């Protein structure tokens, strides 16, 4: 081979710039790509970042093509060497350098700066020179495949890949026919991408006949390209400075000096580039990649919910009764198709989680010397318990185009979007004892039939021998005033006379329609005195109302403490209303027109209605107010003093709303005596089983109206208060009656007792 051709190749590759230029790609243009040993190529500082094959691979991988198949043939090759560099003695036989290059070296001087090296040498001539290369050409067919799409199209991705391999192997035999069939598959499925390339030396007479510089380099498994640093042709006093300048240019983009100390290397930034240690582009790419990974994580869960296996599982779930988390778990474990699909999801999310962790570690590693603090949160894996709760929400909280989250403890939905239209009718619970045997066909929320020993009563199952109509002879629990909550609220706003309970106002500290000082606690009581006046009734409270007037320009609000005695008795035998706790309502304040008076209303409704005989109300200021020495708050009110006037309020009206229930004390006392007698005779329950069932029903219905308590604490025992104050039983008699009922409930009916707390 003549010297001119070698010289041409020499100048072509020695002075060809193999350097890194700043990348201007958008973050969307790259994605996670090659194996771990090539991860450094994602940086703009990688020497092959702009190579054609690398960019093509990244672009195809971003489009979802994960497999590359390439078939090629070489049609010529020969190896050339840079004989000028192979000379051992560069002092006696210097390398024949271009005059421009020699002039650039002389311009550097004896002690050039890093920036001088970059501007004079590196930006013009690069950092490496070519030692040897293999020239030639190839004809190739490259095919990128997306196995997931092939799997969906054909049902078996392995067979599809083998068929494509066989088709591509006939490329060099029947090129036109093979390409036509491959293009048809590419258009119809979108699962493959086919590229033809013909590169190589087309003629040796001139460089213009070559496709590109890289086209003459064969890309095979052997190492075909050998480079060496450009410092070997520099004078010795410039070699170290050139290496330092080249590293600063490659690793710091020419924006600082690359220094290493104590095994830690970093860029010492110039004043005009204070953020040179922070690869903003790489960080943005990784943040964008992490955001896409988080979206893919969410999409993986949606794909499972939209899969045929999950939909068929939802269709097979029984809809004729309520499904608890445990029963859904049992159906979940018995569905083998869903289990295999769920295992695929787990393996996919585990692989995705590892990718996210690797990328996040790289992101935080790159951000060590940045002012930019990355904000990334690892997506949480949905546990099996969360999947079961999700299934429950899809069953019962997916109605009218709205959706929500189901709360099994409350058997209700929390709808999203500030609406209550997402809840479907919640089916009844099927089980043993007093649970339903079957739900009603007319109303799935109610029982349709009951288990043996129980009977259906108003949509629920009760012990068979209990006659609820007979209980009404003792206490008329159900009246014509059992309104719905919305009706009750409307009637209370209108002050309907049907809900008035005529009580007696008692107070030594307050007089109605008279101003008083709120800096001291005030007490008043509303009582019925049923033991003297209305012995044939017990009374139910469903709300309270109070009209409070203030002085002008006063914003003083009272704070209420309300104690209720359910069946008379001392103050210690009452319970405190827990306003705003455990779902208990609060006072509502409404101002009356053209006045300084307000209506304070408390609506208990059907949920929190309860028995009452006396209501004790304590009032005090909500905020701590200044008091004057030697004042007791009992003297006459001086409204002329402007400093005191703001502390005065008056109550013009106070009213309890509710209704009365008929109460047959004599009949109930005879039933209690029968229970007491059966207990004293050694537990002869069978002879009086109807009475025992009747008293159990009455006790349950009375204690059901007890006030709310904190979770885990026992309910208050109102039944014992009724026995003590309305039937006048002694404490020993009350203990015997309750013990007899508990024994019958546990030993005969085989039901668990509900713990209660003593009130009276």
UniProtKB/Swiss-Prot annotation:
Annotated Gene Ontology cellular components are: cytoplasm; dendrite; glutamatergic synapse; neuronal cell body; synapse
Instruction: Extract the Pfam families matched here.
Output: BRINP (PF19052), EGF_BRNP1-3 (PF25415), MACPF (PF01823)
Could you list this entry's UniProt keywords, alphabetically sorted: Cell cycle, Cytoplasm, Glycoprotein, Growth arrest, Neurogenesis, Signal
Sequence intervals crossing the membrane: none
Residue span(s) of domain MACPF: 68-251
Query: Among the record's GO biological process terms, what is one?
Result: negative regulation of mitotic cell cycle
**Signal sequence residues:** 1-16
Q: InterPro entries under this entry?
A: BRINP, MACPF
Keyword Nucleotide-binding recorded? no
- Annotated glycan sites: 156, 433, 443, 553, 599, 630, 676
Tell me the compartments it is located in: Cytoplasm
Q: Which SMART domains match?
A: MACPF
Regarding protein family, the annotation reads: Belongs to the BRINP family.
Q: What does this protein do?
A: Plays a role in neurogenesis and brain development. May suppress cell cycle progression in postmitotic neurons by inhibiting G1/S transition.
In Swiss-Prot or TrEMBL terms, this protein is called BMP/retinoic acid-inducible neural-specific protein 1
Gene name tied to this protein: Brinp1
């Amino acid at each position: 081979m003549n010297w001119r051709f070698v010289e041409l190749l020499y100048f072509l590759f020695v002075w060809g710039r193999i350097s890194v230029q700043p990348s201007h790609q958008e973050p969307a243009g790259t994605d996670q790509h090659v194996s771990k040993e090539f991860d450094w190529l994602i940086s703009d500082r990688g020497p092959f970042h702009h190579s054609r094959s690398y960019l093509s691979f990244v672009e195809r991988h971003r489009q979802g093509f994960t497999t590359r198949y390439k078939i090629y043939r070489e049609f010529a090759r020969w190896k050339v060497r840079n004989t000028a560099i192979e000379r051992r003695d560069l002092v006696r036989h210097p390398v024949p350098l271009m005059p421009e290059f020699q002039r650039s070296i002389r311009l550097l001087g004896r002690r050039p700066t890093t920036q001088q090296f970059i501007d004079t040498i590196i930006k013009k001539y690069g950092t490496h020179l070519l030692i040897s290369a293999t020239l030639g050409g190839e004809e190739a067919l490259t095919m990128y495949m997306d196995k997931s799409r092939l799997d969906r199209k054909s049902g078996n991705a392995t067979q599809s890949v083998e068929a494509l391999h066989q088709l591509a192997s006939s490329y060099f035999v029947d090129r036109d026919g093979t390409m036509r069939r491959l293009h048809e598959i590419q258009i119809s499925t979108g699962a493959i991408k086919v590229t033809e390339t013909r590169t190589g030396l087309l003629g040796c007479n001139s460089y213009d006949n070559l496709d590109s510089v890289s086209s003459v380099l064969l890309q095979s498994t052997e190492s075909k390209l050998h480079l060496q640093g450009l410092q070997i042709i520099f004078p010795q006093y410039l070699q170290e400075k050139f290496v330092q300048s080249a590293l600063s240019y490659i690793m710091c983009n020419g924006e600082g000096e690359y220094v290493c100390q104590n095994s830690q290397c970093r860029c010492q930034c110039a004043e005009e580039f204070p953020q040179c240690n922070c690869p903003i582009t790489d960080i943005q790419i990784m943040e964008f990649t992490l955001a896409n990974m988080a979206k893919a994580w969410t999409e993986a869960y949606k794909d499972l919910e939209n899969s045929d296996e999950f939909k068929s599982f939802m269709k097979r779930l029984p809809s004729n009764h309520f499904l608890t988390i445990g029963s859904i778990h049992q159906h979940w474990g018995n569905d083998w198709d869903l289990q295999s699909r769920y295992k695929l999801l787990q393996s996919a999310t585990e692989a995705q989680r590892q990718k996210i962790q690797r990328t996040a570690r790289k992101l935080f590693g790159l951000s060590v010397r940045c002012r930019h603090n990355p904000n990334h949160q690892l997506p949480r894996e949905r546990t099996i318990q969360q999947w079961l709760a999700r299934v429950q929400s899809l069953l019962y909280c997916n109605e009218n185009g709205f959706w929500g989250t189901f709360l099994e403890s409350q058997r209700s939905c929390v709808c999203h979007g500030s609406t209550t239209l997402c809840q479907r009718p919640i089916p009844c619970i099927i089980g043993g004892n007093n649970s339903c045997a079957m739900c009603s066909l007319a109303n799935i929320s109610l029982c349709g039939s009951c288990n043996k020993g129980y009977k259906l009563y108003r949509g629920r199952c009760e012990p068979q021998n209990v006659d609820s109509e007979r209980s009404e002879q003792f206490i008329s629990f159900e009246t014509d005033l059992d309104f719905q909550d919305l009706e009750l609220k409307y009637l209370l706003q209108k002050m309907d006379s049907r809900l008035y309970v005529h009580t007696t106002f008692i107070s030594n500290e307050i007089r109605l329609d008279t101003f008083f000082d709120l800096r001291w606690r005030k007490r008043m009581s509303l009582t019925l005195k049923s033991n003297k006046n209305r012995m044939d009734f017990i009374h139910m409270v469903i709300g309270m109302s109070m009209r409070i007037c203030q002085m002008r320009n006063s914003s003083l609000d009272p704070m209420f403490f309300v104690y209720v005695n359910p069946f008379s008795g001392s103050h210690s035998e009452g319970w405190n209303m827990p306003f705003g706790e455990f779902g208990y309502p609060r006072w509502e304040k409404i101002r009356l027109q053209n006045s300084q008076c307000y209506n304070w209303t408390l609506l208990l409704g059907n949920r929190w209605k309860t028995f009452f005989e006396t209501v004790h109300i304590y009032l005090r200021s909500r905020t701590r107010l200044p008091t004057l020495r030697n004042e007791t708050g009992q003297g006459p009110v001086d409204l002329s003093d402007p400093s005191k006037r703001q502390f005065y309020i008056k109550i013009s009206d106070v009213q309890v709303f509710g209704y009365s229930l008929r109460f047959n004390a004599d009949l109930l006392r005879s039933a209690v005596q029968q229970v007491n007698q059966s207990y004293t005779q050694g537990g002869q329950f069978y002879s009086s089983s109807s009475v025992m069932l009747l008293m159990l029903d009455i006790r349950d219905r009375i204690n059901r109206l007890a006030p709310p308590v904190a979770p885990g604490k026992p309910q208050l025992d109102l039944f014992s208060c009724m026995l003590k104050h309305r039937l006048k039983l002694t404490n020993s008699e009350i203990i015997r009656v309750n013990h007899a009922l508990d024994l019958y409930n546990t030993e005969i009916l085989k039901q668990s007792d509900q713990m209660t707390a003593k009130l009276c």
